[in-house]
Amino acid sequence: MATVAERCPICLEDPSNYSMALPCLHAFCYVCITRWIRQNPTCPLCKVPVESVVHTIESDSEFKETKVSVDFDYDSEEDEDSFEGQFLAVDSGDAPANISAWNGPMAFVPLNANGTAGAPRLQPLVDWLVERLDQLFETPELALVMRNIVMDTLCEHGCNEEELTRQFWPMFHEDTVPFVTDLIVQAELCVASRPILPIARGRGVEYIDSSSSSSSSEEETDSDIEVDPNNLTDPEDTSDETSTDNSSAQAPRQEDSRPARARPGPPTRGRRRGRRPAAPGPASRRSARLRRRQPRTNSRTNGGDNGEIIDLTLDSDGDTEPADVSGSLNTTDQPVLIPDEEEAAPASPHTSSNSAIICLVSELTPESEEPPRDQPVAPSGSSAGERPMRPRCSLREFARRFMALAPRDSSTSEAAGPSRLGAGPRATEPFSVAVVLVDRSSEGAGLFGGRFAQHVRRRTEDESARRRGNVLLRPRRQSVPPVPYPDIASTSPLIRQGGQRVRDLQRAFQTQPAEPEEMRCPHNCQRYRRNQ
């Protein structure tokens, strides 16, 4: 017999259930060699067809041999059908020629270390064994041991009923016959339900004929020919090209015979996207000049009048200010005059790119007093039958009024005194921000220096909520200030005692106690030192 191999060539571990393949006598694990032979009945090392497997070797005369009934011949043309046919015959309904090829010992694999099946196809058999052995034995530990014994017996004897009955009789006694019968049925179902297919054997190096290689190269050159997408005519077509020129020349004549349709021009942008504004006529210009807004009631002022308001903040798209900005002013319901942009241009003496955009929010009365709320104030320069007049003033006068209306802090206004421009009760009202673009060539350009913007008023919580869609944010988390130590000078005696106690503890931890002097015996005896 051959010597025992140090490691299995398949799993590279110490061989369990030492086995050898005949006739080459190469040593493997029993599980590894049986799995290998089911896929390819040749030796993994020397590629010699395996005739039998010797396993459970106790001595030179005591061992077990399992024969491989497949006669594998490399030179024959039926080498694939001879081994594959015995495993695929189960699907066709015919019994295989050698039944030990699919229900013999090589069809079963021992359990893994964790108690699961060694092969996925045997897992239903292991599940059945778990249920059946739990019914026959009392403890789960004993059932686990019997499960391993049953699977090892199947790996050695296969579905041999006589041998299984003889092996299981000392353990199952009167339950041996029904258990073996059910075990064989379950084992054959698991093995026969999934026939084992062999791995395709390699044919080695295949040499290609030179004639076939030349033909393939010609096909590759034909496929590499570039095709001009502009010239897709048939190369065999020999028709004259003049016919195509004549047909192309006649094409525009046929198109000219059709009635011409007016093509729509590019869309123009109006005030609303996707709609074309109608051409303004003389009546529409006059109506735009005298257009007035409908009066709106203000619940805060209860219908009282506070002064004249001229709104000149309309942009080119016709959008007005947000409702929250205008609603924050304590104003009255006055008609608003929208000036005509076409006639306002020639009124300015100087025309330049930097035109003056005036945002006149309110106007001060000569006495700097508010009119009574019960008496409405008529607009300046307008009467019942007359057309309202535009306020005409110089740029310097407007600058003075604008700075008087600008928002400022109450502390700054009080410190400045009444000598400052616009000092009065109306100077501290919250007004919206206004930006004035001044013509540099006009009068008073040096006062502004180009662009002039006042401080932006901070929005209130209600205004911010309306801008977010009436969604209120939860208040921010405020940091808690550190709690100081209790004051000794407090009137409460409990607080004074606690503060004094805290300071005493701090003083005690900061000072270190003095080390006591070591008492020594004059004779330096260890007994005296130990007693101390």
From Swiss-Prot:
Provide an example Pfam family for this protein.
Answer: zf-C3HC4
Q: What is this protein called?
A: E3 ubiquitin-protein ligase ICP0
Endpoints of the signal sequence: none
Zinc finger motifs (RING-type), residue ranges = 8-47
- Bias class Basic residues marks the residues at 286-295
Q: Where is this region: Disordered?
A: 206-391, 406-426, 461-498, 510-532
Describe the reaction catalysed, as an equation: S-ubiquitinyl-[E2 ubiquitin-conjugating enzyme]-L-cysteine + [acceptor protein]-L-lysine = [E2 ubiquitin-conjugating enzyme]-L-cysteine + N(6)-ubiquitinyl-[acceptor protein]-L-lysine
**EC number of the protein:** 2.3.2.27
Q: What is its biological role?
A: Evades nuclear antiviral defenses triggered by dsDNA viruses. Acts during the initial stages of lytic infection and the reactivation of latent viral genome. Prevents the antiviral effect of nuclear bodies by degrading host PML and SP100.
What GO terms in the biological process aspect are recorded for it? protein monoubiquitination; protein polyubiquitination; symbiont-mediated disruption of host cell PML body; symbiont-mediated perturbation of host exit from mitosis; symbiont-mediated perturbation of host ubiquitin-like protein modification; symbiont-mediated suppression of host cytoplasmic pattern recognition receptor signaling pathway via inhibition of IRF3 activity
Record-listed Zn(2+) 1 binding positions: 8, 11, 29, 32
The known PTMs are summarized as: Auto-ubiquitinated.
- Which stretches does UniProt call biased (Acidic residues)? 217-227, 234-243
State the species of origin. Equine herpesvirus 1 (strain Ab4p)
Q: Could you tell me one molecular function GO term of this UniProt entry?
A: DNA binding
Show the PANTHER family listed in the entry.
E3 UBIQUITIN-PROTEIN LIGASE TOPORS (PTHR46077), TOP1 BINDING ARGININE_SERINE RICH PROTEIN, E3 UBIQUITIN LIGASE (PTHR46077:SF1)
Which keywords label this protein? Answer: Activator, DNA-binding, Early protein, Host-virus interaction, Inhibition of host innate immune response by virus, Inhibition of host IRF3 by virus, Inhibition of host mitotic exit by virus, Inhibition of host RLR pathway by virus, Metal-binding, Modulation of host cell cycle by virus, Modulation of host ubiquitin pathway by viral E3 ligase, Modulation of host ubiquitin pathway by virus, Repressor, Transcription, Transcription regulation, Transferase, Ubl conjugation, Ubl conjugation pathway, Viral immunoevasion, Zinc, Zinc-finger
- The yes or no answer to whether the keyword Protease is present is no
InterPro entries, A to Z? Znf_C3HC4_RING-type, Znf_RING, Znf_RING/FYVE/PHD, Znf_RING_CS
List ligand-binding residues for Zn(2+) 2.
Answer: 24, 26, 43, 46
